[in-house]
Amino acid sequence: MSKPLCSTGLRWLWLVVVVLIIDLGSKYLILQNFALGDTVGLFPSLNLHYARNYGAAFSFLADSGGWQRWFFAGIAIGICVILLVMMYRSKATQKLNNIAYALIIGGALGNLFDRLWHGFVVDMIDFYVGDWHFATFNLADSAICIGAALIVLEGFLPKPTAKEQA
C-alpha cells in the first residue's frame, strides 16, 4: 500500500523547482549578456565571469575528449534517482534531510540540463583573494555543496527519540 506523497519527503520537491529556476535563470542571464571570458566585478573578492566547464568540479576530466559529458550526466541522473527514493522513504517532518536532498537534486538537474543542452556547464561565480582565484562555479554547485554540508551537519545532530518522532 502506498503512502500519501504529502507525508513523505517528496513534499519538499518545490525546493528543487526553486533551485532550478534560480540556477537556470542566472545561467540564461550570463549567456545572454556575456561573451565567453567576460568579467564584471560585483564586490571586492567577487566577480561574475563567464566560463564553460566541460568536466566536473574544478574542471576534473575537462580535457577527456567528450565521453565525460555522458559519464557525468549518468552520475547526475543516478544521484537524483537515489535521493528521490530517499525522500520518498523519509517523513516530510525530517526537514534537514529533505532540504539537503532537494538542494542536491536541484543543483544536479541544473548542471545536467547544461551538459545535455549546451555540452558544457555554465559557470559564472569567481571568488578571489588577491591574485588567487577559487575555481569558477555556479548556483547549482552552491546548492549541491550546501545540501552536502547539511547532510554532514545532520550526522552530528542528536537523533530524535521515538517519542519525539511520533
Swiss-Prot record:
State the UniProt keywords alphabetically.
Answer: Aspartyl protease, Cell inner membrane, Cell membrane, Hydrolase, Membrane, Protease, Transmembrane, Transmembrane helix
Reactions catalysed, as given in the entry? Release of signal peptides from bacterial membrane prolipoproteins. Hydrolyzes -Xaa-Yaa-Zaa-|-(S,diacylglyceryl)Cys-, in which Xaa is hydrophobic (preferably Leu), and Yaa (Ala or Ser) and Zaa (Gly or Ala) have small, neutral side chains
The protein's matches in InterPro entries, at most eight in alphabetical order, are given as: Peptidase_A8
Q: Where are the transmembrane segments?
A: 12-32, 70-90, 102-122, 137-157
Keyword Coiled coil listed? The answer is no
Tell me the pathway.
Protein modification; lipoprotein biosynthesis (signal peptide cleavage)
Q: What is its main location?
A: membrane
Active site positions? 123, 141
Q: Which cysteines link up through disulfide bonds?
A: none
What EC number(s) does this enzyme carry? 3.4.23.36
- Gene Ontology MF annotations: aspartic-type endopeptidase activity
Annotated coiled-coil positions are none
Name its cellular compartments.
Cell inner membrane
Q: What Gene Ontology cellular-component terms does the record carry?
A: plasma membrane
Q: What membrane topology does the annotation report for this chain?
A: Multi-pass membrane protein
Query: What GO terms in the biological process aspect are recorded for it?
Result: proteolysis
Q: What does this protein do?
A: This protein specifically catalyzes the removal of signal peptides from prolipoproteins.
Q: Which family does it belong to?
A: Belongs to the peptidase A8 family.
Q: Which NCBIfam families match?
A: lspA (TIGR00077)
Protein name as annotated? Lipoprotein signal peptidase
Native organism: Salmonella schwarzengrund (strain CVM19633)
Which gene underlies this protein?
lspA
